[in-house]
Amino acid sequence: MQQTMQAQQLRRMAERSAVAFLLAVLCVYPLYIDKFSNLGVVKFTGVATLSWAFCLWLGALAAIGARPRAGRLPWRTDHGLWALGAVVATGVVSTVTSLSPAMSLWGLGGYYGGCMMVLFTAVGYLAVRAFAPQKLLNGLTFCVGITTALVTVLYVLNIFNIDLIGTYADTAVVERAQFFSTLGQKNFCSGFMAFALPLVFYAFLVARGARHTVFYGVPAFFGGLALAVVDADGLALGIGAAVLVLLCQKIFTTRTLRRLMVIGMFFFADAGWMQYMRTHVYTQGGKPILAAFGHYAQLGFAVCAAVWAVLFFALRSREIPLWKAGRVLAAIAVTLGVVLVVLANFMPGFPSLGKLDDLLVFNDDWGTYRGTAWRISWSAWTAQPFWRKLLGVGPGMMHTAVAQWAGADITARMKTFYAAHNEYLELLLTSGVLGLAAWVWFVTAHLRKAAQNWLRPGVAPVTLALVSYLAHAAVSIRVSMIFPEIMLPVSYTHLTLPTN
């Protein structure tokens, strides 16, 4: 009896420690600010120390008797755990065979992060999956919302050269305009928002009662502001993908649509304000793709308000399921997008669609020369010997591999790229076919499990966040410091309901 009570006390201590770990990684760590933190060694050291400290503490608790609840780590039957092992194994192998093993170990050759990042993130994933309480996510989402609001406010202040904490004290104004972001560069902020905003918005969509609606509505307002200011095509793509998935779920009713209209009003109000500020106050810096809606802010706000009013006053408290219509709408949107991309790129004489050509036509200039990064990364991979095609050139070695491939023909533009600006292409080059296959296996296993566990607490918002990030990754960088932010909550898709 005494041993049972001791084991329960140790488990509760481990669960509290897992909660603290998640809060530290998701809510406190993103607020750590250093200049140009995509490559920040100090920031990497911070997250590595944070992760290893918590993981060692949880490991010590497990060693003296703390046991996870039944079914948390069924390694014999769980494809997700085997896939995680494959991701780690391929990362280790590609590091050992890297063009520079030392740089690949620590991830000092580029934005992507190295083998050490994969190792401590994998251990953190196992720790959270073993001990994190399943009902934690409501409180965690609120804390993530507060962090999102703070990050967004600091981001906006930096756009207008208001540097409250001296992040850019010795940085030229022009450089600030190019690299404005409270987290060093916009890529970190884009990746963080791609994962955090679906959590924040979903909490507002399902909030019941006035108190919860206000609590989650405030972060949702700042989430709308983030969409209007964060200069990243990937963020727009990610949020769009998450919305399409949401439309297909049975949760999508007239009530959900009404809340979406409120988020729409938040966004158009924020976009209109930012459009005014950029026009009359500050004209430097990048301009996000969604900021174009600032030109139609009044019309967009009015449409959202009208739809909300019709749904609220006409239906009162009734909820009408809309998920069937949502699936039709999602299918039409995806089909139309695919058809337009195929026609714009492969049909000779296809008429111009104006500014949409910047999105639909893939060439070297796409996304501020991101197309160049894709082309040279693919070319560098195809130039590798067969064994390197399988194992990769090593984490963080994209720039080195491109330089070796281009040789004397390397251009000034090529020299600026330290990442492929596409996570899947980056994995193919740095970790090879085996590394990419392992990551796809891991993601697929978790998405399949998420579909099965959709109604369990915490699964739906994490799944939408994962979908958003995976879409974002197709046109953006996996900034290494974001990797733990993604992997730890993803474990929620595999959590089982407590049995004791």
What does each model-found stretch correspond to?
Residues L105-G114:
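Non-cytosolic membrane-interface motifs at loop->transmembrane helix junctions
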Residues Q2-R11, G71-W75, R318-A325, N500:
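Membrane-interfacial, low-structure loops and terminal tails that flank and connect transmembrane helices
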Residues Q185, Y369-T416, S431-G435:
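TM-adjacent membrane-interface loops and short helices in multi-pass inner/ER membrane proteins
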Residues A63-P74, S94-L105:
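Transmembrane alpha-helix boundary signature
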Residues T493-T499:
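Conserved small/polar residues in nucleotide/adenosyl-binding loops
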Residues H79-G80, G166-V173, D357-W387:
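Extracytoplasmic loop-helix module adjacent to an early transmembrane segment
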